């Protein structure tokens, strides 16, 4: 769920999780156009992963709670998750790790999607 995702971001990143809520064309609610950079691409992939979870697992990823461990920046989805919970956990894990590796461009925070997301 979104709280677990927020906590995964906090585990793997020094930047505050809010920095990822309204970034580029895909970080935050919805998304369209071409990702503006590598970090925005992480969010596009995460959105697609959630879409797949909705169709394949018949669940609501933003509401699906799962079990995971965070230790020294390492994320592990626990074995006791159901198939759907594990799928969503891995969507969030992959995105959080991607956020940690991708450069952050301040100019892409709170961009106008009508102008920058074609």
Curated annotation (Swiss-Prot):
Snake venom phospholipase A2 (PLA2) that has only a weak enzymatic activity. It has a myotoxic activity in vivo (dystrophic effect). PLA2 catalyzes the calcium-dependent hydrolysis of the 2-acyl groups in 3-sn-phosphoglycerides. This is Basic phospholipase A2 nigroxin B. GO terms for cellular component: extracellular region. GO terms for biological process: arachidonate secretion; fatty acid biosynthetic process; lipid catabolic process; phospholipid metabolic process; positive regulation of fibroblast proliferation. Disulfide bonds join 11-70, 25-117, 27-43, 42-98, 49-91, 59-84, 77-89. It is found in: Secreted. GO terms for molecular function: calcium ion binding; calcium-dependent phospholipase A2 activity; phospholipid binding; signaling receptor binding; toxin activity. It holds the Pfam family Phospholip_A2_1. Belongs to the phospholipase A2 family. Group I subfamily. D49 sub-subfamily. Its main location: secreted. Expressed by the venom gland. Its cofactor is Ca(2+). Keywords: Calcium, Disulfide bond, Hydrolase, Lipid degradation, Lipid metabolism, Metal-binding, Myotoxin, Secreted, Toxin. SUPFAM superfamilies: Phospholipase A2, PLA2. It catalyses: a 1,2-diacyl-sn-glycero-3-phosphocholine + H2O = a 1-acyl-sn-glycero-3-phosphocholine + a fatty acid + H(+). Binds 1 Ca(2+) ion. The keyword Lipoprotein does not apply. The active site is at 46, 92. Ca(2+) binds at residues 26, 28, 30, 47. It comes from the Eukaryota. Its EC number is 3.1.1.4.
């Amino acid at each position: 769920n979104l709280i677990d995702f927020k906590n995964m971001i906090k585990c793997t990143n020094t930047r505050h999780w809010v920095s990822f809520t309204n970034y580029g064309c895909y970080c935050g609610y919805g998304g369209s156009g071409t990702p503006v950079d590598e970090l925005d691409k992480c969010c596009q992939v995460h959105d697609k992963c959630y879409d797949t979870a909705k169709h394949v697992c018949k669940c609501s990823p933003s509401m699906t709670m799962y079990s995971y461990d965070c230790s020294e920046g390492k994320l592990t989805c626990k074995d006791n998750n159901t198939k759907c919970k594990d799928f969503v956990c891995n969507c969030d894990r992959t995105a959080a790790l991607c956020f940690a590796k991708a450069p952050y461009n301040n100019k892409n925070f709170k961009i106008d999607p009508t102008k920058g997301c074609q």
